[in-house]
Amino acid sequence: MAIKKRNKIRLPSGSPEEVGIDGSAHKPMQQIKPLVSNDSEDDDNDICVLQPIKFKKVPKRDITFDGEQAIKEDNSHYEDLYHSKKNTNASTRNKDDLLILNMEDLMEGNHHLLSDSSEAGSSSEGEHISSIPTRGEIAKLKAQKSLSRRKISESDVTTERDYVKLLDSEDKREIMETIRLNGGLKRNNEKEITNFSDDEMQGFQDEMLALTDNQIAIQKDSKRKIIEKAINEVPYRTNEEWETQLLSKGNINKSNEKIITPLPVLFPDDDESGNSIERINEMVSKICLQRKKVEMRLQALEKTKIDLEKSKASLINKLIGN
């Protein structure tokens, strides 16, 4: 890095008044000569070379408080956690020391391989081989398996529990997923539907979704007609004779119910004239009383009919709303 000097500008030494009197301000300014030379030798001498920074190692100081002594940490217990390279090299085994055993070979009389390998191996290898089952243990395991197979064969019926015991967690998860997609588990109170054809399902298909107000009104009217048709088809009006008999009493059911037939003129005798009039009056009063009773019953029936029609309309509206 070359450092160059700046050019200095020399100002006139005289006062500004003298400069104005002498008229030096009107003189042309001379060019200022540079004071620094452009020689390459001077530039090389002016280059400053930065020295590398060096840091000194300072020992770590242990900070101790008043009345306390510095305690050195014992890191010996960490050595047990990490094995050295010497220990790892000693623990490694050669590929020739490994021995592959077959259960059938052991049963056929090749058990002498175990003894040879145990004699040739180290103490650690001997511990590993000692965990291999003996001939008696192998025979015992085979006997237990044969007993379990015999129990299954005696039943001749494989239950779902026996099948599930052979499955792992992934198979069980897949089975539960397929059950969930097919409608879930079947309850005991559900009825079994067999031979259910597609033609029978046509009545249960969903209708087109009504989006506009006009479509909603048309759908409600169609539902109302279907419900009213189903209600009218119910044969609950089987015993209507009592109603006709009730209306026929007192000439209420006839067209000329307000017209009373005139009675014939009787020629009363001297003795029986009073008794006959009283009988006629009693009969007329009984008929009028009976007629009033029938009219009251008819009014009550009409009132109940109106209430039933109102409840029917409200029930239809609820069914359409749902």
From Swiss-Prot:
InterPro entries per the UniProt record, alphabetical: Ntr2
Region (Disordered): 1-30, 113-137
GO cellular component entries: cytoplasm; endoplasmic reticulum; nucleus; spliceosomal complex; U2-type post-mRNA release spliceosomal complex
GO BP: spliceosomal complex disassembly
Low complexity composition bias: residue spans: 115-132
Compartment(s): Cytoplasm; Nucleus
Nucleus as UniProt keyword: yes
Pfam families the record matches: NTR2
Record key words, sorted: Cytoplasm, mRNA processing, mRNA splicing, Nucleus, Phosphoprotein, Spliceosome
Modified residues (Phosphoserine): 40, 153, 197
Subunit annotation: Component of the NTR complex (NTC-related complex), composed of NTR1, NTR2 and PRP43. Interacts with CLF1, NTR1 and PRP43.
Function: Involved in pre-mRNA splicing and spliceosome disassembly. Promotes release of excised lariat intron from the spliceosome by acting as a receptor for PRP43. This targeting of PRP43 leads to disassembly of the spliceosome with the separation of the U2, U5, U6 snRNPs and the NTC complex.
Additional notes on this entry: Present with 892 molecules/cell in log phase SD medium.
Protein name according to UniProt: Pre-mRNA-splicing factor NTR2
Source organism of the structure: Saccharomyces cerevisiae (strain ATCC 204508 / S288c)
